Amino acid sequence: MIYKPPIKDLKQKLKSEGFCFLPNIFNSNRTNIAYNALWDVIQGKYETGKPPDARFWEIGDDPNNIIKIDKPHLCNKKIWDLITDNNFGQWLANVTDAKRIQVWHSQVVWKPPCSGKKGIAGWHRDNQYWPFWTPEGVFTAWIALSDVNPESGPVRYIQGSNQWNNIAGLDFFDKNISEQYKILQDAQSDYKVINATIRKGQVSIHSSLTYHSSMQNTSQSPRVGMVVHFCTDYAKRIPVNGELSRYLNCLEDT
């Protein structure tokens, strides 16, 4: 029997540590369907006829780079169905203590095997890239579409970092992890890193203020995650102008 922690324990963990791991939400059939649908999108096959919001990897690009595509749910109904699944939404609402949740952005993050340094994502907070939200009430859910072990380059969380002040110099795009560790050490001499080693179909949730990163995938299989950014009824928008304003202009997409 698979142990399922009580909702109250998951709520407390998310609040105090900045992240939590849900039990298996999606069965193997659902994850396999979504996996194949995402691969179609990566290959430029759009079932709905609509392109994604943005592609950060094109066919013919370096296969060792992390493949990241924004809003793949627009391209394929199976992906749409995955991120709008009622049971999934109920879990997110329960754990975040929300009366209502809404997906406002999605990404596929496909980390190739043996990706080397190109598979590294630097330490960062999601909030530092989201000037259009206040920190409270905004979260990220990471759906594992492949088993994630220590060799896969799992997402790594710093326990309790959701309660820290901002640390200047940390950045998702900075692959020089050794230098980032120096910055972390100067700011916080004592901290604990937890790997999100979860099984296919499980989900990790983290706060917009939780520092996280990932190392290269040294395994023989891709590490595939469907990233779902969602807001709750207690999230507050901040008016912004320019390119960033488009992120929240199409909330009806999800």
Give residue ranges: language-model regions:
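Double-stranded beta-helix
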Residues: 148-211, 235, 246-249
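Non-heme Fe(II)/2-oxoglutarate
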Residues: 36, 44, 48-54, 61, ...
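Extracellular structured ligand-interaction cores
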Residues: 19, 105, 136-140, 152, ...
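A short beta-loop-beta micro-motif enriched in histidine and acidic residues
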Residues: 97, 126-138, 191, 198, ...
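Short, structured patches in soluble enzyme cores that scaffold and shape functional sites
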Residues: 107, 125-127, 143-147, 159
